[in-house]
């Protein structure tokens, strides 16, 4: 704690998550320089991904269309449903192996 010590500053420990590339995969396109994977960052991202308060009317989250059981795609509908149940023009793309996606 900073308030209890004037001589020693204790920095919080940040647990990094290793990014392991399978032996049969090419090098990842995305480089994690300056964006280290950490447990805190992972859990913050997960919380934001499933938080409906981030939508215009607080009714839908990213996870509403990018469904975990479906490889973070959407198997329930031909096209994604958005705010006010408006239909999109396409289905939610898969969120899987994004470190290898070029665009």
Predicted regions and their residues:
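Short, flexible, mixed-charge glycine/proline-rich loop motifs
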Residues: 52-56
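Gly/Gly-Pro-rich "capping" loops immediately C-terminal to redox-active cysteine motifs
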Residues: 68-103
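The canonical Cys-X-X-Cys-His
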Residues: 45, 57-69, 95
């Amino acid at each position: 704690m900073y308030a209890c010590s004037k001589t020693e500053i204790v920095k919080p420990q940040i647990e990094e998550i290793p990014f392991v590339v399978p032996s049969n995969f090419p090098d990842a396109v995305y480089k994690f320089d300056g964006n280290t994977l950490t447990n805190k960052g992972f859990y913050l991202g997960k919380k934001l991904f499933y938080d409906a308060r981030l939508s215009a009317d607080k009714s839908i989250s990213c996870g509403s269309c990018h469904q975990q059981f479906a490889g973070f795609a959407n198997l329930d509908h031909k096209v994604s449903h958005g705010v006010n149940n408006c239909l999109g023009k396409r289905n939610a793309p898969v969120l899987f192996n994004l470190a290898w996606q070029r665009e």
